[in-house]
């Protein structure tokens, strides 16, 4: 199936029936689909469940490339990685394809108010404001684009640990002080809600790009409290499972560090990933509440998608970057006016 066929078919159908619908593209960073250690019985995502009740859930949605920038570039252009030439996180889309028309750009040029909050395109550029604007494609894809940082209070950890003693700088967890809005995803949700309220009846395309559960696995402490560590069990691969091969990206550095994890460290990191997921889910709920309050479900297409999957210890791996199911399969949930909710499909989706 061609990439984005499902999304654009839904989009075109709703446009034909009702004029310009609103489009809410919600992206989650490093959010895996269910399976392995990460099951519906373990992780608490009431707002994803709430969205699924209104939507079609695609259970076999596969990304083009299991790394953030290549996957997002493919999603937003409709091109595979061999066509975009983007196979890493080091180059912005326009450096490779200066004249490509992206999905939000298409909507912007067709009359939608187009705004982005958080991570829709990969957020490169470091602390250089102009570089970051180029990375998020401000001006071309969006009327406005904004990203966010944790506050001083949100950077204060009430508990936490560097699991690999510095070997992998990203492999840390932290139960943070402060409120949801002291972390970026809370600010992203608040800004998205404010923009929805501000735009009123104008047709809009809003990208709401949550940054969790991507590492570092930090969330307000109350989300860690949802997962008492003594209620979790370490994952054990079936005996016939093949581990990630040494030829995999970063295996030497990563594999050595992962191989030293004790069962307790595995539980700590898994708990933190679940906590970050539940934190993101709570922010999703705030955005869904805005659609409820504004009465927008009958004129809004909602697309929730992950940029790729993630291993949480399966095959002795804690990352993406592989071609295994856990890394290549991503969440995809679509709600649209006139679509029956609570449906699932196992049709292959790119």
Region roles according to the model:
Residues 8-17:
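Hydrophobic h-region of N-terminal signal peptides that target proteins for export
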Residues 1-9:
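Sec-dependent signal peptide recognition
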Residues 2-3, 16-350:
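Formylglycine-dependent sulfatase
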């Amino acid at each position: 199936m061609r990439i984005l066929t499902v999304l654009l078919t839904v989009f075109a159908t709703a446009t034909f029936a009702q004029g310009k619908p609103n489009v809410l593209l919600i992206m989650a960073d490093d959010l895996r689909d269910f399976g392995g250690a990460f099951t519906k019985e373990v992780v608490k995502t009431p707002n994803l469940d709430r969205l699924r009740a209104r939507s079609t859930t695609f259970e076999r949605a596969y990304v083009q490339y299991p790394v953030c920038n290549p996957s997002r570039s493919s999603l937003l252009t409709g091109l595979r990685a061999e066509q975009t030439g983007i196979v890493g996180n080091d180059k912005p889309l326009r450096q490779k394809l200066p004249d490509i028309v992206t999905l939000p750009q298409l909507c912007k040029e067709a009359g939608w108010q187009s705004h982005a909050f958080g991570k829709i395109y990969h957020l490169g550029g470091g602390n250089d404001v102009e570089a970051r604007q180029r990375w998020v494609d401000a001006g071309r894809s969006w009327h406005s684009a904004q990203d966010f940082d944790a506050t001083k209070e949100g950077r204060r950890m009430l508990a936490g640990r560097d699991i690999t003693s510095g070997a992998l700088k990203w492999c840390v967890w932290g139960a943070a002080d402060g409120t949801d809005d002291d972390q970026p995803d809370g600010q992203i949700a608040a800004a998205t809600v404010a923009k929805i309220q501000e735009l009123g009846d104008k047709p809009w395309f809003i990208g709401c790009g949550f940054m969790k559960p991507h590492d570092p696995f930090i969330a307000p402490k109350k989300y860690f409290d949802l997962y008492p560590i003594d209620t979790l069990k370490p994952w054990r691969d079936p005996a016939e499972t093949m581990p990630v091969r040494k030829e995999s990206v970063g295996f030497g550095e990563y594999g050595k560090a992962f191989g030293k994890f004790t069962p307790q460290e595995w539980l700590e990191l898994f708990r933190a990933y679940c906590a970050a997921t539940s934190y993101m889910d709570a922010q999703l709920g705030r955005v869904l509440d805005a659609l409820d309050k504004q009465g927008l479900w009958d004129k809004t297409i909602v697309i929730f998608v992950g940029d790729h999957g993630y291993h949480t210890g399966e095959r002795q791996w804690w990352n993406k970057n592989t071609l295994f199911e856990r890394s290549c399969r991503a969440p995809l949930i679509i709600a649209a006016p006139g679509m029956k909710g609570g449906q699932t499909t196992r049709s292959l989706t790119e």
